[in-house]
Curated annotation (Swiss-Prot):
This is Ubinuclein-2. Expressed in several cell lines tested, including primary and transformed cell lines. Residues 16-37, 67-79, 122-134, 574-584 have a biased composition (Basic and acidic residues). There is a cross-link at K272 (Glycyl lysine isopeptide (Lys-Gly) (interchain with G-Cter in SUMO2)). The keyword Acetylation applies. GO terms for cellular component: extracellular space; nucleoplasm; nucleus. The modification Phosphoserine is found at S13, S250, S311, S416, S419, S422, S584, S1123. GO terms for biological process: chromatin organization. It comes from Homo sapiens (Human). Residues 93-110, 1046-1060 have a biased composition (Pro residues). Residues 1-134, 250-301, 573-597, 707-740, 815-849, 880-913, 981-1006, 1035-1218 are annotated as: Disordered. Keywords: Acetylation, Isopeptide bond, Phosphoprotein, Ubl conjugation. Pfam families: HUN, UBN_AB.
Length: 1347
């Protein structure tokens, strides 16, 4: 180990010589090692024999006792003589004898030793050193110095070869001395004096400090590099102690220089005072410059001026620092003193005396002279290598004088940016002023960008001139008012130019101002803002005056109010105290409350103040526009301005920033209106009632329905208005319930507006209409509820009969209320369910829609829950239509009602042909109305009316086909009411309905969520379970066929936005017929009436669609669809029921489909955003479920029945669940309101495989949706789940009751069932009304008379 170390330590040419003399490769290493020490301690190796002993002492010195492992050459051992030379210096003397020429070369000494005794000992060349290596610790580790080891060994050998090394005091002392010298050499001492002035000896007094230490603040400039000859006044490095005081570092000069420095700074100020301060600074800087110049030279040599980047900071410091300013003089004096010392030392430090002198001069002139490696050829050296120091200092003085005239600050700024200009400038500065300036100017001043405006260039020239004059006059304050004006003028012109040009101009200006570019830009921006603030000053003052003029009066009034209040309060307190002894505590409690309640400091604006405020804001906005980087939005910018600047103009507490913002909105609205628009967006929904019905999503539908509901109420003069006029959506449940009871008697007179969508949007259905619709739904015509939503505006006030029926239905249907809550969709759902129909239509509109849905669902749902669930082929649709016809003719009063409704619908459809939109709406409304009167008169709405009308033809067939028909109608009305209407009338019940149904199903998805859902469900049920829910129950084939027939009018629907829904409209008449046929099928006698209802619902939906040509839009379409959908939903529920009750495979299927459709439609109404197909299904599901429980069965019974159906109910159940969840949206809300919601769900599950359980589409009975509507979206429970849920709780009772009610309602006359919750048939008057509505589609608002 020692060997490697000696190699490291030893590197002396003398050693090599010695090696040459004595072959000893090892020694070579030794020498190299020794050289460092050899200079100080050239010793011989004679001690080798005893190396171990010396080693031990050495270890002490080194902190570890070394034993020599390597054999020392015998020569070394023989060099016992040198041992005396343990002391490094003494050895030097000895070495001379051996090698006088090379006293520093240990090899010669060794040779001398060898020459005496060991010339014969060449083996000596191999040195053995035994070194004891100790484990290193945190404090120390073993270090060996080969030369020292050799010395120690030799000395020991000579002096104490046999003695115990530890007992050798002499050697220990020598070792200690050696150590001291070693450290002296390494860390300081006199040798340093020689080097202290060399450029490379400039030391960084901050070196070694942790730059990242948060405690150390480097923000202020300090002289990082100072000559080694200088140290701080008290030694060390100070942080944040102000200007550093320097003193000579050498021990001898320390005290003198410290004194000098202490006294000199004051002297300098006395001498030069004001002027001197600048000169001092410049002189100091000049010193720096000279240092830098020298650094510059080094730069050329590869050394960079380390301090150049600190120049700016130093500049600042120098301005205030007298001691630093005097530093150069101190250096001069120091140099004089050093001169004498340095001359002898020159040879040691530098190879040539000339070189040595320059370094000293450099140190004297500047703190930062960086490099000692200046070769005599250095260009700048001659400056300092004058023959004598005096000349050198003289030159430095001249340079200082020159620098005094030079703008050092500017130079420093440039230096701070790292521009070589400062360095080279400084360098030249020391040499000659002209050179310096000539170099600085070109480098410092970047050229101006091309193509600047003439005015701008002129102003820049003005700035140049001003800066030049300023420099000549002496630096006092650069940024005078004139200078600021020039800069501001430049800045204002630069604002119009691009950022690149601006940056170029700033870089150019930087050369003329005493700050760097960043500071300049900040100053310009501040000037600009100050000017803007000046512009604000006057308007602010005016506003303040105006406020101060108005405030006294307002303050006086306020004080009067406060006095009056306090008097009243005191009086009250007294009375209270008299009354109660404990009044004091209560009074204390009251006092704060009264203070809060007390008179408000409300400022009353007048036009003058408002105008002044607006003017102020306008100016401030101009300032905002000028800001290059707008970190804040205009709104935040203005608010902060008002908070900080404007608000304080009022007495405290009299003004809020938000009021200022509000009052000045007219001025800043164009910038701050975006958020406002967002906030206002919700408000428009109610306004766009018609359009919204078409476009709004289901969730928005309730609101629309609510809004529309008042209109309907206005239209409906009968008691229905009273009962239904409750809160729009949520109150619709209660309203429907009330209306439901009153609706039964009023079944005969149901007035629905023909154009469900449009009119409903503008005219909310009256309570009468809603009640009638509910009654109709209760009677088993459950088609309207879904459509009723859309048709609500169109529905005209329904007669009292509907209200009575609705009231009765409501009382009977427990589920009605929850459905009503859903709002329009909810009401539809309730109506569909029949029992639920009543409660659903809290809003007249909602009631009407709900009623329609209920009516449709009641009949349809009972008959074929299954059918509703699965898509129905065209053939099935046709069969369903046929069955509907049969049912229509054969079914009891309800069937009759359905028939009449269907007939009306047919008529309506034809009328629609003429004026399809209106006719479709009216038809749908009529159908719905009929259904409502039968099932849920309260729900009768424009949609109901349409449904009623459409039902007129296919009332009986409603179970399957009618539902489809309704869906078609709805869809078509929504998209293109007229066109669809016509196709509906045109297609034969079987044929048209079939064809159009698929389209309808598709259309529904196209339409808005609620409408879409309705339409989709209808279409899907029309094809599988679209609107057929009600009729679907009647005949399973019919459900398939009927919905498909509805699709037949597809061509017509295709014109509409939703292709599928559109066909449904056109197929409406067909569907009605089909529905009738479907209803007729024996499997579903009840279904017949139900079919009729669905047919009506279809009509209503169609009407709705017609009314909202934008049926595709979630809102409008949804509404119209929802009514039909709701009808379907009850149908779905019933469909589940009928399969259980009159289980007929085809019938069941049909019913199921029907129910599915209704549920979907209902849900659709609920969740308008849902795709049309799913949406309509959802809608129908919601309506269906509600209707089923309430409408089909009496109250709870209806709900229970759908539950009963396990197969379809599974679908229904899913729907029901979905409906429940969706009820809050629209159709779902209906379902949720109705306790039998689950029941509806089961029909949904049962009815439609397609209908995947959607949480939202619970009530939405998935119809066999020809259009693949993603029911999953709504989260219908699985079909099975739906069944389970329904049957689990109220499924058995509800399903049974619902089925019974639906069947009964459908079979008996609509009036009968109106009285009974689930009367499947629409009241005669309802049917008539629907029919009339269908005929006068244009007059959607005309009340319909019951035929």
């Amino acid at each position: 180990m020692a060997e490697p170390r000696r190699v490291a330590f030893i590197s002396l040419s003398p050693v090599r010589r010695r090696e040459a003399e004595y072959p000893g490769p090892e020694r070579e290493p030794e020498y190299p090692r020794e050289p460092p020490r050899l200079e100080p301690q050239p010793y011989r190796e004679p001690a080798r024999a005893e190396p171990p002993a010396p080693r031990e002492p050495a270890p002490r010195s080194d902190a570890q006792p070394p034993s020599r492992e390597k054999p020392l050459p015998q020569r070394e051992v023989s060099r016992a003589e040198p041992p005396m030379s343990l002391q490094r210096e003494p050895p030097r003397p000895e070495p001379p004898p051996p090698f006088p020429p090379l006293p520093l070369q240990p090899p010669p000494p060794r040779e001398s030793a060898s020459r005496a005794e060991q010339p014969p000992r060449p083996p000596r060349e191999t040195v053995r050193l035994e070194l004891v290596l100790k484990d290193p610790t945190d404090e120390s580790c073993v270090e060996f110095s080969y030369p020292e080891l050799l010395l120690c060994g030799e000395q020991r050998k000579k002096l104490i070869h046999t003695e115990d090394p530890f007992n050798d005091e002499h050697q220990e002392r020598q070792e200690v001395e050696m150590l001291a010298k070693k450290f002296e050499m390494k860390y300081g001492g006199k040798p340093r004096k020689h080097r202290k002035d060399r450029l490379q000896d400039l030391i960084d007094i901050g070196f070694g400090y942790d730059e990242t230490d948060p405690f150390i603040d480097n923000s202020e400039a300090y002289d990082e590099l100072v000559p080694a000859s200088l140290t701080t006044k008290y030694g060390g490095f100070y942080i944040n102690t102000g200007t550093l005081q320097f003193r000579q570092a050498s021990d001898t000069e320390e005290d003198d220089i410290t004194d000098n420095q202490k006294h000199k700074p004051p002297k300098v100020p006395k001498i030069k005072e004001d002027d001197i301060e600048m000169k001092k600074r410049k002189r100091k800087e000049e010193g720096e410059k000279e240092k830098k110049p020298r650094k510059k030279v080094p730069k050329q040599l590869g050394v960079v001026a380390l301090n150049s980047h600190k120049s700016e900071k130093k500049k600042k410091r120098y301005k205030d620092s007298l001691s630093l300013a005097a530093m150069i003089r101190k250096f001069q004096k120091e140099k004089d003193a050093l001169k004498k010392e340095s001359n002898p030392k020159v040879p040691v430090t530098l190879s040539t005396p000339s070189l040595n002198k320059p370094p000293c001069a450099a140190a004297a002139l500047g703190n930062d002279v960086p490099d000692l490696n200046l070769s005599s050829g250095d260009p700048d050296l001659p400056i300092f290598v004058s023959t004598n120091e005096h000349e050198l200092f003289q030159e430095a003085e001249n340079a200082l004088e020159m620098l005094d005239d030079f703008d050092f600050d500017r130079l420093l700024d440039a230096a701070s940016d790292g521009s070589p200009l400062s360095e080279s400038g400084g360098e030249n500065g020391t040499t000659t002023q002209p050179t310096y300036t000539s170099q600085v100017m070109p480098k410092v001043v970047p050229t101006l960008p091309e193509g600047l405006p003439v005015l701008l260039e002129k102003r820049i020239e003005d700035l140049r001139v001003a800066a030049k004059l300023f420099d000549e006059e002496g630096r006092k304050k650069f940024f005078t008012q004139d200078m600021n004006n020039i800069l501001l003028d430049i800045e204002l012109q630069l604002q119009e130019l691009g950022p690149v040009i601006r940056s170029g101009v700033y870089s150019h200006l930087e050369a003329f101002v005493p700050c760097n570019k960043e500071t300049l830009v900040k100053r310009l921006k501040k000037l600009h803002l100050n000017v803007q603030d000046d512009r604000l000053r006057e308007p602010l003052q005016k506003l303040k005056l105006a406020v101060s003029n108005v405030m006294p009066e307002q303050l006086f009034k306020y004080q009067e109010d406060c006095q009056a209040r306090s008097q009243a309060k005191c009086a009250k307190l007294q009375t209270d105290e008299e009354r109660e002894k404990n009044g004091s505590e209560e009074d204390d409690d009251e006092k704060p409350g009264k203070r809060v309640i007390g008179p408000r400091k409300k400022f009353h604006w007048d036009d003058t103040i408002r105008t002044l405020l607006c003017n102020l804001v306008e100016i401030k906005l101009g300032c905002y526009e000028l800001e290059p980087n707008k970190s804040q939005s205009a709104e935040d910018y203005l608010k902060s301005f008002m908070e900080t600047e404007v608000k304080p103009l009022w007495p405290k507490g009299w003004m809020q920033a938000r009021m200022l913002f509000k009052e000045s909105r007219s001025v800043h609205n164009h910038l701050t209106s975006a958020p406002a628009k967002k906030k206002v967006i919700p408000a428009p929904k109610p306004k766009v009632k018609e359009v919204m019905v078409k476009t709004l999503p289901l969730h928005s539908f309730p609101t629309m329905l609510k809004e529309c509901s008042p209109k309907k109420d206005q239209k409906t003069p009968t008691s229905l208005v009273a009962s239904v006029s409750g809160p729009p959506t949520s109150s619709s449940t209660a309203a429907i319930a009330a209306a439901s009871s009153s609706s039964a008697p009023a079944q005969e007179t149901i007035c629905l507006d023909d154009s469900l969508d449009e009119d409903l949007s503008f005219h909310s259905p009256s309570l009468d209409l809603v009640s009638e619709a509910l009654a109709v739904i209760n009677n088993g015509n459950k088609g309207p509820p879904v459509g009723s939503r859309i048709s609500m505006p169109t529905t005209k006030p329904r007669p009292g009969l509907r209200e009575e029926k609705l009231a009765s239905i409501m009382s009977k249907l427990p589920l009605a209320t929850p459905k009503k809550l859903d709002s329009t969709q909810t009401t539809h759902s309730s109506s569909l369910i029949a029992g639920h129909t009543g409660p659903v239509p809290k809003k007249p509109q909602d009631l009407a829609h709900t009623g329609i849905s209920s009516g449709l669902i009641a009949g349809s749902s009972i008959q074929n829950p299954k059918v509703s669930l699965e898509p129905l082929p065209a053939r099935l649709l046709q069969q369903g239509l046929q069955r509907s016809s049969q049912i229509h003719t054969s079914s009891s009063s309800q069937t009759h009602v359905s028939s009449s409704s269907q007939a009306q619908i047919a008529a309506s459809s034809h009328a629609l042909g003429t004026s399809e939109a209106q006719d479709a709406s009216s038809l749908t409304q009529v159908t719905k109305v009929h259904q409502h009167s039968a099932v849920q008169q309260n729900y009768v709405s424009p949609l109901q009316a349409t449904i009623s009308k459409s039902q007129t033809n296919p009332v009986v067939k409603l179970s399957n086909n009618p539902q489809l028909s309704c869906s078609s109608s709805l869809i078509k009305t929504s998209d293109k009411p007229l066109m669809y209407r016509l196709p509906l009338s045109t297609p034969s019940p079987g044929n048209g309905s079939q064809g159009s149904h698929p389209l309808v199903s598709r259309t529904v998805p196209s339409t808005t969520t609620s409408s879409n859902y309705l339409a989709k469900a209808m279409v899907s049920q029309i094809s599988t379970q679209g609107f057929k829910s009600p009729f679907s129950m009647a005949a399973s084939p019919k459900l398939a066929a009927s919905p498909k027939p509805a699709t037949s009018p597809k061509p017509l629907p295709s014109p509409k936005p939703s292709a599928s829904p559109k066909p449904s409209l056109s197929a409406k008449p067909s569907v009605s017929t089909k529905l009738i046929s479907k209803s007729n099928p024996t499997p579903k006698p009840t279904v017949s009436p139900s079919s009729s209802s669905p047919n009506a619902l279809v009509a209503q939906g169609s009407h709705s669609s017609t009314n909202s040509p934008v049926h595709k839009q979630p809102s409008g379409m949804n509404i119209s669809r929802q009514s039909p959908t709701l009808n379907l939903l009850p149908s779905s529920r019933t469909s589940g029921l009928p399969p259980t009750k009159n289980l007929q495979a085809p019938s069941k299927l049909t019913n199921s489909s029907s129910t599915g459709t209704v549920g979907k439609n209902s849900l659709s109404g609920i969740a308008m955003n849902v795709p049309a197909s799913r949406g309509s299904n959802l809608n129908s599901s919601g309506a269906n479920r509600t209707s089923l429980s309430g409408g089909t069965g009496s109250g709870t019974q209806g709900a229970t029945k759908p539950l009963s159906t396990p197969h379809r109910p599974s679908t229904a159940s899913g729907s029901s669940v979905v409906t429940a969840s969706v009820q809050s949206t629209a159709g779902a809300s209906l379902l949720a309101n109705a306790s039998p919601l689950t029941l509806m769900t089961s029909p949904l599950s049962v009815t439609n495989q397609n209908v995947t359980p959607f949480g939202m589409l619970g009530g939405l009975v998935p119809v066999t949706m020809p259009f693949q509507f993603p029911l999953e979206i709504f989260g219908f429970g699985t079909d099975t789940a739906g069944v389970t849920t329904t049957s689990g709780s109220t499924s058995a009772a509800f399903h049974h009751s619902l089925t019974q009610n639906l069947l009964k309602g459908l079979q008996p006359g609509g009036a009968q069932h109106a009285a009974t919750l689930s009367h499947s048939p629409l009241p005669a008057h309802l049917q008539q009304a629907f029919h009339d509505g269908g005929q006068s589609k244009g007059d959607t608002k005309l009340p319909r008379k019951s035929q």
